[in-house]
């Protein structure tokens, strides 16, 4: 667990998100307020597996993975807001995306800052808005929905 109550290191992130390499796309949470917002980062390196084919001559992070990382940040905020503790019986699924826009490419060496805000929650469905930024420049913005579901074993 992180030293500060409003941050999350990778060990705590792993308790909340079911994703693992190569699909865990959040490295650290810098700040969050339950029910309001979360600020997370992803450090993008040339060693990312997707750069082997997207694109070898001009490596660019796929937009769908930027959205997935934003959805993972949203999932962390949802867990922190709608659950008290992570549980292997509960997941937050990416349920929808609207108004996604891409403004700039993400390249090796970039650090993406994800800012997600909770708009509303009803019956386990959360609505969020998110932005991804590199060096203060907008990379991507979207509205994201996630749904809380219990896993039946």
From Swiss-Prot:
Active site: 54
Subcellular location: Cytoplasm
Gene Ontology biological-process annotations: fatty acid biosynthetic process; lipid A biosynthetic process
Enzyme's top EC category: lyase
Main location per the UniProt record: cytoplasm
SUPFAM superfamilies: Thioesterase/thiol ester dehydrase-isomerase
Catalytic activity of the protein: a (3R)-hydroxyacyl-[ACP] = a (2E)-enoyl-[ACP] + H2O
EC numbers, comma separated: 4.2.1.59
Gene3D superfamilies in the cross-refs: Hotdog Thioesterase (3.10.129.10)
Keywords assigned by UniProt, alphabetized: Cytoplasm, Lipid A biosynthesis, Lipid biosynthesis, Lipid metabolism, Lyase
InterPro entries in the record: FabA_FabZ (IPR013114), FabZ (IPR010084), HotDog_dom_sf (IPR029069)
One Pfam family from the record: FabA
UniProt GO MF annotations: (3R)-hydroxyacyl-[acyl-carrier-protein] dehydratase activity
GO terms for cellular component: cytoplasm; membrane
Function: Involved in unsaturated fatty acids biosynthesis. Catalyzes the dehydration of short chain beta-hydroxyacyl-ACPs and long chain saturated and unsaturated beta-hydroxyacyl-ACPs.
Protein name: 3-hydroxyacyl-[acyl-carrier-protein] dehydratase FabZ
């Amino acid at each position: 667990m992180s030293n500060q109550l409003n941050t999350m290191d990778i060990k705590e992130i792993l308790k909340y998100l079911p994703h693992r390499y190569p699909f865990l796309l959040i490295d650290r949470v810098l700040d969050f307020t339950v029910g309001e917002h979360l600020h997370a980062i992803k450090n993008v390196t040339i060693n990312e597996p997707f750069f082997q084919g997207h694109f070898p001559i001009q490596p660019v992070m796929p937009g769908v993975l930027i959205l997935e990382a934003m959805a993972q940040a949203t999932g962390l905020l949802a867990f922190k807001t709608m659950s008290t503790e992570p549980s292997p019986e509960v997941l937050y699924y990416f349920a929808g995306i609207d108004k996604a826009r891409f403004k700039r490419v993400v390249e090796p060496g970039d650090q993406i800052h994800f800012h997600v805000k909770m708009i509303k929650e009803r019956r386990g469905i959360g609505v969020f808005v998110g932005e991804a930024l590199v060096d203060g420049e907008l990379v991507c913005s979207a509205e994201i929905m996630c749904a809380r579901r219990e896993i039946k074993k």
